[in-house]
């Protein structure tokens, strides 16, 4: 018979929790009464916010890198080739569109490399593999 993966399931029934001894109950309730019943802030489970952000950014079409920092980066890189270069705003916009499209595509390939290695976390070696498979780096 073939093996199948077991998945964890939440229990719907089972034993009721045991009653605590009076001293344990008093010890557990004492700190909460001293602090004045301050409620802890709500926290989502790990991964929930990440999945929400993934869905949000996959729906959106706006640029993710801020315009001015990207413009400064382009001008800084261009200084190495020629001083006093001028750029049309549409040229910097086109560079930014192309750069973001390239980065998104590269991270998609990097994620596939991590998944292939049976991981969910991308690592530098995944990025190196993705670039090598594309022929960008030997």
Curated annotation (Swiss-Prot):
This protein's GO cellular component annotations are: nucleosome; nucleus
PTM: Phosphorylated to form H3S10ph. H3S10ph promotes subsequent H3K14ac formation and is required for transcriptional activation through TBP recruitment to the promoters. Mono-, di- and trimethylated by the COMPASS complex to form H3K4me1/2/3. H3K4me activates gene expression by regulating transcription elongation and plays a role in telomere length maintenance. H3K4me enrichment correlates with transcription levels, and occurs in a 5' to 3' gradient with H3K4me3 enrichment at the 5'-end of genes, shifting to H3K4me2 and then H3K4me1. Methylated by SET2 to form H3K36me. H3K36me represses gene expression. Methylated by DOT1 to form H3K79me. H3K79me is required for association of SIR proteins with telomeric regions and for telomeric silencing.
So which domain of life are we looking at? Eukaryota
Q: Kindly give the InterPro entries that the UniProt entry links to this protein.
A: Histone-fold, Histone_H2A/H2B/H3, Histone_H3/CENP-A
| Positions of region (Disordered) | 1-49
Which residues in this protein are found as N6,N6,N6-trimethyllysine? 5, 28, 39, 82
Q: Which Gene3D superfamilies match?
A: Histone, subunit A
* N6-methyllysine sites (modified residues): 5, 10, 15, 19, 24, 28, 39, 82
- Give the matching PANTHER family: HISTONE H3
What protein am I looking at? Histone H3
- Species of origin reads Cryptococcus neoformans var. neoformans serotype D (strain JEC21 / ATCC MYA-565)
Gene this protein is translated from: HHT1
């Amino acid at each position: 018979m073939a093996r199948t993966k077991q998945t964890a399931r939440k229990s719907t029934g089972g034993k009721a929790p045991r009653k605590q001894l009076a001293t344990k109950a008093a010890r557990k309730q004492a700190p909460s009464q001293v602090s004045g019943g301050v409620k802890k802030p709500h926290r989502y489970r790990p991964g929930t916010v990440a999945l929400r952000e993934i869905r949000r950014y996959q729906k959106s079409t706006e640029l993710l890198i801020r315009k001015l920092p990207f413009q400064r980066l382009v001008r800084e890189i261009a200084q190495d080739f020629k001083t006093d270069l001028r750029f049309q705003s549409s040229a910097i916009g086109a560079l930014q569109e192309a750069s973001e499209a390239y980065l998104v595509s590269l991270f998609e390939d990097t994620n596939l490399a991590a998944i292939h290695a049976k991981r969910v976390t991308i690592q530098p070696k995944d990025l190196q593999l993705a670039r090598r498979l594309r022929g960008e780096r030997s």
